[in-house]
Swiss-Prot record:
Belongs to the HisA/HisF family. The active site is at D11, D130. This is Imidazole glycerol phosphate synthase subunit HisF. Keywords: Amino-acid biosynthesis, Cytoplasm, Histidine biosynthesis, Lyase. Pathway: Amino-acid biosynthesis; L-histidine biosynthesis; L-histidine from 5-phospho-alpha-D-ribose 1-diphosphate: step 5/9. CDD domains: HisF (cd04731). Its main location: cytoplasm. IGPS catalyzes the conversion of PRFAR and glutamine to IGP, AICAR and glutamate. The HisF subunit catalyzes the cyclization activity that produces IGP and AICAR from PRFAR using the ammonia provided by the HisH subunit. HAMAP family: HisF. One of its GO terms (molecular function) is lyase activity. It comes from Salmonella typhimurium (strain LT2 / SGSC1412 / ATCC 700720). Its EC number is 4.3.2.10. Pfam families: His_biosynth. It is found in: Cytoplasm.
Length: 258
């Protein structure tokens, strides 16, 4: 059995780490490189960086901080933000990133997933999915350009359909960003995770809602996700990664202990 992964998420805007609630009202958390090093030292299995306005601004993630992060950490990290071509991805990987993640650009051009997977290998290609539960329809819908609340829009895709589509096109991993739960800290949406897990054959990462150590346990035990991503509980030092891993190991979760 592969060890479950604990993954801090760092949303980047204007060169700093920020955090919002339900993808809105972002506050500044701090500088990118010191936070990355802190999480690596605490025992994170990998890091994910989202340049949250790159896609909506029509630009690619700023590569300068990617190189600086690579210099100070020795764990894998994934970078997302406006990657629209093989050349964009190649440059980010050349600066030291281990994986690249695409989200809004994949919705705009689904063939991008296949082209990137063919060029760099599926293990390198992550697809992020921003999913929102609509009370009116009772369905989960995929959203696009969520880094800018003024440009966010609901797409034609229902979440489960898009999960299956991106797998067929070559996604090597899926990060499910559950927008209703984002920053609220009342637990991951286990109902949605179970539905996605039923149709997801590649590694599945839960994102959105972690507030306690028990929430991580529930995601691993009840929804069988491969990794749990969180931001505010780590940024605000509500949960220490080393202590979280010790707790999970004590509950029988296969986890890498530093």
């Amino acid at each position: 059995m592969l060890a479950k992964r604990i993954i801090p998420c760092l949303d980047v805007r204007d060169g700093q780490v920020v955090k919002g609630v339900q993808f809105r009202n972002h506050e500044i958390i701090g500088d990118i490189v010191p936070l990355a090093k802190r999480y690596a030292d605490e025992g994170a299995d990998e890091l994910v960086f989202y340049d949250i306005t790159a896609s909506s601004d029509g630009r690619v993630v700023d590569k300068s901080w990617v190189a600086r992060v690579a210099e100070v950490i020795d764990i894998p990290f994934c970078v997302a933000g406006g990657i629209r071509s093989i050349d964009d991805a190649a440059k980010i990987l050349s600066f030291g990133a281990d994986k690249i993640s695409i989200n809004s650009p994949a919705l705009a051009d689904p063939t991008l997933i296949t082209r990137l997977a063919d060029r760099f290998g599926v293990q390198c290609i992550v697809v992020g999915i921003d999913t929102w539960f609509d009370d009116a329809t009772g369905k989960y819908h995929v959203n696009q350009y969520t880094g800018d609340e003024n440009r966010t829009r609901v797409t034609q895709w229902e979440t489960l359909d898009w999960v299956q589509e991106v797998q067929q096109r070559g996604a090597g991993e899926i990060v499910l960003n559950m927008m209703n739960q984002d920053g609220v800290r009342n637990g991951y949406d286990l109902t949605q995770l179970k539905k996605v897990r039923d149709v997801c054959r590649v590694p599945l990462i839960a994102s959105g809602g972690a507030g306690t150590m028990e929430h991580f346990l529930e995601a691993f035990r009840d929804a069988d996700v491969d990794g749990a991503l969180a931001a505010s509980v780590f940024h605000k030092q509500i949960i220490n990664i080393g202590e979280l891993k010790a707790y999970l190991a004590g509950q029988g979760v296969e986890i890498r202990i530093c």
